[in-house]
C-alpha cells in the first residue's frame, strides 16, 4: 500500500535530500557539459554518441528512453549526427519497423580519442567518494529512481 501522509520531519528531510541531490547532479553534469561543448556538441548529441560508443547499436526508441528524450528530439539529434558522419541508421532486417543507430568509423575513431578523457573527468568528479561509497550510491539512486518511477504510474 502506498503511503499518503508524511510528518513534517519526513517532508523536510525529503526536500533537503532533493536539494542536495539536484546540486550534486548539476555539479557532476557540468563536467559532461564542458566536455561536449569542448568538442563542438551539445550535451544531448554527446550523450547519444557516448551511449552508442559504450553500448553499441541501439534502436532509436531505446536511445530516447535511455536518455529520457522525446521522439522528436531523438530524430533531430540523430539527423544532425548522421549529416556530420558520426553515425548511420539501419533498418532491422528482422523487424522492418525498427531502426538502429550505430557509429560510423569516423564516429568510433573520434570517440576512441575523446571518450577516455571524458571518462577520467567523470571519475575525477566522483573521486570525493570511496569506491564503496560509489557502489552504495549506485544502489541507493537506483532504488530511489525505481520507486519514484513506480509512483508516476499509480
UniProtKB/Swiss-Prot annotation:
InterPro entries: HTH_MarR-typ, MarR/SlyA-like, Tscrpt_reg_MarR-type_CS, WH-like_DNA-bd_sf, WH_DNA-bd_sf. Residues 14-146 form the HTH marR-type domain. One of its GO terms (molecular function) is DNA-binding transcription factor activity. Residues 60-83 bind DNA. SUPFAM superfamilies: Winged helix' DNA-binding domain (SSF46785). Keywords: DNA-binding, Transcription, Transcription regulation. PROSITE patterns: HTH_MARR_1, HTH_MARR_2. GO terms for biological process: regulation of DNA-templated transcription; response to stress. This is Uncharacterized HTH-type transcriptional regulator YkoM.
Amino acid at each position: 500500500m502506498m503511503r499518503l501522509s508524511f510528518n513534517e520531519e519526513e517532508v523536510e528531510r525529503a526536500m533537503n535530500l532533493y536539494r542536495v541531490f539536484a546540486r550534486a547532479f548539476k555539479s557532476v553534469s557540468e563536467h559532461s557539459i564542458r566536455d561536449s561543448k569542448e568538442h563542438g556538441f551539445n550535451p544531448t548529441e554527446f550523450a547519444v554518441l557516448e551511449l552508442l560508443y559504450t553500448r553499441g547499436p541501439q534502436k532509436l526508441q531505446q536511445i530516447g528512453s535511455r536518455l529520457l528524450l522525446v521522439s522528436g528530439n531523438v530524430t533531430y539529434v540523430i539527423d544532425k549526427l548522421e549529416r556530420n558522419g558520426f553515425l548511420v541508421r539501419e533498418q532491422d532486417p528482422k523487424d522492418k519497423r525498427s531502426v538502429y543507430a550505430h557509429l560510423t568509423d569516423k564516429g568510433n575513431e573520434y570517440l576512441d580519442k575523446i571518450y577516455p578523457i571524458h571518462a577520467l573527468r567523470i571519475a575525477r568528479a566522483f573521486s570525493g567518494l570511496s569506491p564503496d561509497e560509489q557502489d552504495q550510491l549506485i544502489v541507493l539512486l537506483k532504488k530511489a529512481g525505481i520507486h519514484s518511477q513506480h509512483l508516476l504510474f499509480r
